[in-house]
């Protein structure tokens, strides 16, 4: 775990390009209700600086925010739900037993869709220091608001100033400085890996589907050789025979696309509900109309391409040979 001092907060805040900085505490806490004990995270911050709410997008669901000097708590959204933290949820103005101390609940934050954050307890830094007065307490994070036009330079300057304050050499730091863009990029990289894995599975599925469609159309042509011969004997052109079988293969692809969209939406919706039930509601599927259309069109084209060769074979059938075919 990282450990930062008040002096290091001031070092960060005095760095050129930094508008404001604040230290944040994060500890484990024991809570108790009706004789049942649980261990959760408790986060302490300076309510005079709204950086916490800005970074973690915390919005009050009911009650109020913490104010300087408060010896009370604001709870995450999960404390409002039955059978999430305890069987019976908390309500506004209830008392929570925190580290053996009775503390009043003055508010609840709206859900951020992340189980750990929605299960956290929030207090002021001063109250945090009071709750843990018997143990050494250091800031776990320093959050800063900086000039976004020169964010890379500011990040490097913060690293340089903290290294100097800690007496550490470059490359041997026991901390790191990360911008919000860096965090998004790291999450995006992990998400891209998952997406490409899913795309690979989808491409394999498309390949298998194309082969199955081609086999189906070849079988259809073989079973209808006499029918093709009859149509040609009464004047059907090669192009018309080709169009008939190409339409059939395209229609097979269209039906497969529609069914795929229906089952895909159903499974995505079910997966979203399962993910939400375990506390990660921010990971939810979206269903843009263009994606549905694109999937169905792609499936139709795949069917058409897969059926092109069997359709051509059907159009080239000799009517005399076809009528003698057994």
Language model features by range: what are they?
Residues 184-198, 221-222, 251, 255, ...:
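Alpha-helical membrane-interface segments at transmembrane helix boundaries
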Residues 5, 180-190, 200, 239-243, ...:
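Alpha-helical membrane-protein architecture signal
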Residues 196, 205-272, 276, 294, ...:
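Transmembrane alpha-helical interface segments in multi-pass membrane proteins
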């Amino acid at each position: 775990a990282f450990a930062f001092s008040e002096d290091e907060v001031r070092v960060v805040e005095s760095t050129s390009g930094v508008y404001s900085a604040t230290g944040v505490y994060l500890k484990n806490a024991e809570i108790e209700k009706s004789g049942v004990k649980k261990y959760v995270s408790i986060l302490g911050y300076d309510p005079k600086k709204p950086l916490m709410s800005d970074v973690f997008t915390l919005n009050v669901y009911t009650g109020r925010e913490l104010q300087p000097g408060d010896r009370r708590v604001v709870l995450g959204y999960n404390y409002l739900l039955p059978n999430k933290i305890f069987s019976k949820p908390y309500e506004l103005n209830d008392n929570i037993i925190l580290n053996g101390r009775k503390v009043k609940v003055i508010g609840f934050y709206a859900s951020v869709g992340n189980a750990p954050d929605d299960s956290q307890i929030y207090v002021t830094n001063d109250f945090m220091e009071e709750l843990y007065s018997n143990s050494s307490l250091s800031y776990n994070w320093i959050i800063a608001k900086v000039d976004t036009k020169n964010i890379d330079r500011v990040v490097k300057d913060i690293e340089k100033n903290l290294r100097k304050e800690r007496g550490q050499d470059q490359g041997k730091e026991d901390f790191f400085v990360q911008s919000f863009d860096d965090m998004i990029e790291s999450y995006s990289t992990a998400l891209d890996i998952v997406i490409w894995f899913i795309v690979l599975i989808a491409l394999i599925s498309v390949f298998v589907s194309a082969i199955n469609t081609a086999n189906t159309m070849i079988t259809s042509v073989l079973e209808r050789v006499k029918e093709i011969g009859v149509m040609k004997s009464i004047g059907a052109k090669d192009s018309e025979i080709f169009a008939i079988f190409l339409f059939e293969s395209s229609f097979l692809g269209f039906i497969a696309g529609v069914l795929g969209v229906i089952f895909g939406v159903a499974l995505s919706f079910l997966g979203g509900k399962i993910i939400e039930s375990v506390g990660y509601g921010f990971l939810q599927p979206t269903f843009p109309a263009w994606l549905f259309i694109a999937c169905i069109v792609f499936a139709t084209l795949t069917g058409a391409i897969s059926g092109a060769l069997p359709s051509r074979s059907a159009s080239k059938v000799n009517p005399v040979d076809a009528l003698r075919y057994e």
